[in-house]
Every structure is written in structure tokens, then in C-alpha cells.
Amino acid sequence: YTVAQKALHWIVAIMIIAQVVLHEGMVDAWRTFERTADVSGLSSPVVLLHVWGGLLVLVFAMWRLALRRNRGVPPVPADEPALLKFIAMATHVVLYGLMILLPASGAAAYFGGIEAAGEAHELMKPVLIVLIGLHVAGALYQHFWLKTDVLKRMTHG
């Protein structure tokens, strides 16, 4: 991976963790707004960090996809079982999709008041968390059990 690809990977990872942490504050403000029509909570620092942080995740995800298209990525280990190759590919495709769909649906809910977008946003969150867990578990499995360089390629290798 290029330096830019590695940097964007870790920046987006940190930003997504922050999004998960800030999520409950966003939900609380939104529910208060729905109950009372009081918009003041929708401009709180926690809400604004969640909204604008999400949009940055979207921008960085698009940048990552452009780098991936233009620079490519290292090949998977040649002796990797076909099932693991498929799981890795599918996980990456869905993770990239969620890095686009979650911010887009959140923006549609926040800026456009589209309730269905907010509901979709909520439904995608646990899927993202599970896939992040799978992604991390896969990297650790590659590193400690299969003894490949997959993890090192995204850190210092």
C-alpha cells in the first residue's frame, strides 16, 4: 500500500470509532427533536461532530477508492484458501459500501429530514460494527496463524 493508502485507512478507522462513540448523542438529540420540535440540540457539538465527521468519512472513503483504482492494492497471499479470499473481498466491498451509504443516509436524514434514511442509517450501524470485527479478526488471523504479511502491509511493512 502507498503511504496515502495507509494513512487514509487509519484516519478513517479512527474517525469511524469516533462516529460510533458520538452516535448515542446524535440519537438523543434527534429523538428530542422528534418529540418536542426543539432544534437546539441538533446543533450541539456532539451532533455537529457526528454529522461533519460522517461527511469526512464519506470524502475519505471516496478518496480511498480512487487511490485503490489508480494505485491498486497488493495481491492476496498466493496460498490463501479460496474461502478466505472470498470473505476478504466481500468484507472489503461491503465495508466500502457502508463507508458511503452510512454518511449519505445520515446526511439525508439530518439535512433532508428523510425518516427512512435515518432508519436505514440505524440498521447499517451494527452491520458495520460486525464487519469491522471480522476485518480485524481476519488481519490478526493472517498475522498470527497464517504468518502472512497482510497486517504488516497496512502498518509498517
Question: Language-model features: where?
Answer:
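Membrane-embedded alpha-helical bundles that constitute the cytochrome b-like, heme-associated redox core
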Residues: 1-157
